[in-house]
A protein has these predicted regions:
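Conserved N-terminal catalytic core of the sugar/cofactor nucleotidyltransferase
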Residues: 1-8, 34-110, 114-127, 466-469, ...
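Long, low-complexity, intrinsically disordered segments
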Residues: 476-484
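Conserved alpha/beta core of the MobA/IspD/sugar-nucleotide pyrophosphorylase nucleotidyltransferase superfamily
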Residues: 2-5, 177-280
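Short glycine-enriched, charge-decorated loop/helix-capping segments at active-site entrances
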Residues: 24-30, 198-201
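N-terminal nucleotide-binding beta1-loop-alpha1 segment
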Residues: 1-22
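Structural signal for interior beta-strand "rungs" in well-ordered beta-sheet cores
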Residues: 264-449, 453-455
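Structural beta-sheet core signal
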Residues: 9-11, 54, 108-109, 136-139, ...
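Conserved core of the sugar-phosphate nucleotidyltransferase
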Residues: 61, 117-203, 210, 221
């Protein structure tokens, strides 16, 4: 037998997955912010194997870039084997073994559509496999309803004597509740030898990987099984219903992990957390919150309700309420929301504020500066301790190009100020309400625009006679005359 202490992993991801009814290859569908395949590859990488081989086939032009992207993040070599014709699991492993030429050790075979399988379970499988000399160890699970699965038949020594498919089992065999998961650990040398002896003499006309077990036993090699503690880890995803079910189980796992690590999640059923999200201690997450992508939440933050953060960094003690944010950073002790839209490239400094119905895009808001209400701020820099009045607009687009606005520190702008970029407002400047700023404003200046207010008496009654407005004006004048 081979040296059991070195390992390699084969991940099977060549199938068509027709039940997904999708233009996307099955294993590229996502739960928890990762594709099904990425979950499987991450679990495999958790073994720290010498090599991982992903077997691809159907729509491989879609799958190969995903394999390469995961390889760049897990710190483990992942090679690709192409199964040109989908001729069964045995054939898929034959294709993979070309990438493992000369490898001697334990070969784990798993699938690209089992996103809930943990590295720890694979490690337990390998440990069980290597504890005593073994040719094959099959990962099994116990089900209350095993209908449709291959049954695991053992002898008195606990060795697996057969995997009996549902259609081939007799009455006693079908009472067995331990079933085949489709995940195996093999001795590399015995696997390589047995693969060459497979035949397609079966109903499907394919090469079955499970036949390696019977070949190994026939040649006198021990075959064993290791039972997984949680059968849900081994649930395959073949259609959209199973995708949603797996996503819910994974989210429950991630939410519970966050709570065990010190976060308060008020309503776990309405809180969604992606796999790459990190959450500090004493964070409070209110209902309807989604933390997606590579979002990072520091200690003591309060999030939600009804908040979605994607690839966001939230520093300590920040409050984010009813906000959608993407690819941006919120500083310590900042206050965001409600009904705030944060677009990519925005940075809010310490003690900063983006208030109700504010949209920010590629905006740098300095320490202590506030944009409290009803404002669009795009392509802008705001210094420290400045205040932007309600209903202000940073007019950054001339129809062809985007332009930048720079606001200094300790600036106070009146409500309904328009900043026509490119423009700079110096430190300590003020603007009057309704000002349209088209030119740079010096530090400490007060800027106002527009002429003196002019009231044209009687205009409505003269130009809009008979309208409700004219009638109201006439009645008001009559009342004023009577009062006079």
């Amino acid at each position: 037998m081979s040296n059991p202490h070195s390992s390699a992993v084969i991940v099977l991801a060549a199938g068509a997955g027709t039940r997904m009814k999708s233009a996307k290859q099955k294993t590229l569908h996502s739960i928890g912010g990762r594709s099904l395949l990425a979950h499987s590859l991450h679990a495999a990488a958790g073994l720290s194997p010498q090599r991982i081989v992903a077997v691809i086939g159907h729509r491989r032009e879609q799958v190969r870039p995903e394999v390469e992207a995961v390889a760049a993040t897990v710190g483990c070599e992942i090679s690709v084997a192409v199964q040109e014709q989908q001729n069964g699991t045995g054939h898929a492993v034959q294709c993979a073994m070309h990438e493992l030429e000369g490898f001697e050790g334990t070969v784990v075979v798993t699938n690209g559509d089992v996103p809930l399988l943990r590295s720890e379970t694979l490690r337990s499988l390998v440990d069980a496999h290597t504890a005593v000399p073994t040719a094959v160890t099959v990962l099994t699970m116990s089900l209350s309803d095993p209908t449709g699965y291959g049954r695991i038949v053992r002898n008195e020594e606990g060795e697996v004597t057969a995997i009996v498919e549902q259609k081939d089992g007799d009455e006693e065999t079908l009472k067995i509740t331990e079933v085949n998961s489709g995940v195996f650990a093999f001795d590399a040398a015995i696997l390589r030898s047995s693969l060459g002896k497979l035949d397609s003499n079966n109903a499907q006309g394919e090469l079955y990987l499970t036949d390696v077990l019977s070949i190994a036993r026939t040649e006198g090699h021990p075959v064993r099984a290791y039972r997984a503690h949680d059968h849900r880890e081994l649930a395959g995803v073949n259609d959209r219903v199973q995708l949603a079910q797996a996503g819910k189980i994974l989210n429950q796992r991630l939410v519970e992990d966050a709570m065990r690590n010190g976060a308060t999640i008020v309503d776990p059923d309405t809180t969604w957390i992606d796999s790459e999200v990190t959450i500090g201690r004493d964070v409070i997450i209110h209902p309807g919150t989604q933390l997606l992508g590579n979002t990072s939440i520091a200690d003591n933050c309060v999030l939600g309700p009804d908040t979605t953060l994607t690839n966001m960094v939230i520093d300590e003690d920040a409050h984010v309420i009813r906000t959608h944010g993407f690819d941006s950073r919120i500083g310590a002790h900042a206050n965001i929301g409600p009904f705030t839209y944060i677009r990519p490239g925005t940075v809010v400094g310490e003690n900063g504020k983006l208030g109700g119905f504010v949209e920010a895009k590629n905006a740098q808001i300095g320490r202590g500066s506030k944009v409290p209400h009803l404002t669009y701020i795009g392509d802008a820099t705001v210094g420290e301790e400045s205040n932007i009045g309600a209903s202000s607009v940073f007019v950054n687009y001339d129809g062809v190009n985007k332009h930048h606005t720079t606001i200094g520190s300790h600036v106070r702008t009146g409500s309904d100020t328009m900043f026509i970029a490119p423009v700079t407002v110096g430190d300590g400047a003020y603007s009057g309400a309704g000002t349209v700023i088209k030119e740079d404003v010096p530090a400490g200046a007060l800027v106002v625009s527009g002429g003196k207010q002019r009231n044209i008496e009687g205009w409505v009654e003269k130009n809009r006679p008979g309208t409700p407005a004219a009638n109201a004006a006439r009645q008001a004048h009559a009342h004023e005359t009577k009062e006079g």
